[in-house]
Amino acid sequence: YVEMINDSMKTNKMVGLIQPKNGKKNSVPSLHGVGCLGKITSFKNMDGRYLIDLNGLNRFNIINEIKNNKPYRECEINFDNFQADLKFAKEELKFSDLELIFKNLKSLFKKKGYIINWKSLEKQDLNETINALAMASPFSLEEKQILLESENLEIRKNKITEILATYDYDGFNNTTIQ
């Protein structure tokens, strides 16, 4: 994806991220229909590799894929179904509404060896926090896609709760049933 980042840095510093669907090895996988447009906010070249920070701006639907000779894929996209992403309306959820989710996420992240600065997260906007945790989580690509496609923060919160419930019935205590 080095060429994609190079091309982006020459223009608007934006890239679209789309998850591939599970496909057969050695084939070009089909893409999920919903992705997210992100803006590169930090860029470092490290020995031919890039370390970037990407700020998610707006979800989109794929209209069709554009054929090209580039080592990355391009698509015609549409933002119409995600106009609410552009509105900065305050959601009714509060951090206190998420205490159980945070507790379960902390347990899962610890179990998987993830290190998260929770105090820093609690200083961020709630929407940014939920989105960052959803994408940084050890959830499967399909589970992350479900979260991406969730219509709003309340639905995303409920989906995270449902996904967490599938990981371990006993609160991530490694209990085995035979």
Residue ranges and their predicted role:
Residues 2-115, 142, 146, 153-156, ...:
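Positively charged
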Residues 134, 145-148:
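Amphipathic alpha-helical segments within well-ordered protein domains
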Residues 121-139:
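Core structural elements
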Residues 123-126, 148-153:
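Small/polar glycine-rich anion-binding or flexible loop at a beta-alpha turn
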